Amino acid sequence: MATVLRIDSSALSNGSHSKALADFFQTQWLEKHPTDSFQTLDLSQTPPPHLSEATIGAMFTPTEERSKEQTQQLALSTDYIEQLKKADVILISTPMYNFGIPSTLKAYLDHSLRVGETFVYTDKGPKGLLEGKKAIVVAASGGDYTQSPLDAMNFVTPYLKTALGFIGIEDVTLVEAPGMAGDEASINKSIKQAKQTLQNCL
């Protein structure tokens, strides 16, 4: 039985294309793998705080030297990391906000990319500790940033692929749904293509 960690980041509770595609994937996955389980983290409902000076200080304090207060400061970060470690598949759904990911998703990653927990530094450079996992990134955008020259403005999928690879998750499938601010025909075509890509991930 596999565990899928689903992370939604759209601020919209209704009308989110990225969440709708994640819903589609979850339904299709469970039909094919009925004994698997999904753990959902909706960052719009439980937004993580941005990193503080105290949190950063605790992160870089050796475990054996941390005070009780520092350990408590890292409680949310530790919870996120444990969820990632237990997951076999990570599903991230995100819109594009001003060329990048929502600040909630960035804050989540800031808490999750932690030295000694999800990556370490070696003589050969940084090494990710979450190898062997698969990630699927569903990214929706109002415009089409998949082709030149607008692809240079896309800081969503390149960043997420880099961040996931940094912690050892190299098997990343990018599912993009561009043109969500276009006409109905264009939207339907984009969603259909995204769903086909998602079905190929089952």
Curated annotation (Swiss-Prot):
SUPFAM superfamilies xref list: Flavoproteins (SSF52218)
MF terms (GO), sorted A to Z: electron transfer activity; FMN binding; oxidoreductase activity, acting on NAD(P)H as acceptor; oxidoreductase activity, acting on NAD(P)H, quinone or similar compound as acceptor
Cofactor, free-text remark: Binds 1 FMN per subunit.
Cofactor(s) needed for function: FMN
Keywords from the UniProt entry: Flavoprotein, FMN, NAD, Oxidoreductase
InterPro entries: Flavodoxin_fold, Flavoprotein-like_sf, FMN-dep_NADH:Q_OxRdtase_AzoR1, NADH:quinone_OxRdtase_FMN_depd
EC number(s) on file: 1.6.5.-, 1.7.1.17
UniProt: FMN binding residues: 10, 16-18, 96-99
Catalytic activity: 2 a quinone + NADH + H(+) = 2 a 1,4-benzosemiquinone + NAD(+); N,N-dimethyl-1,4-phenylenediamine + anthranilate + 2 NAD(+) = 2-(4-dimethylaminophenyl)diazenylbenzoate + 2 NADH + 2 H(+)
Family the UniProt entry places it in: Belongs to the azoreductase type 1 family.
HAMAP family in alphabetical order: Azoreductase_type1
Function in brief: Quinone reductase that provides resistance to thiol-specific stress caused by electrophilic quinones.
Quaternary structure (record): Homodimer.
Protein's name according to its UniProt entry: FMN-dependent NADH:quinone oxidoreductase
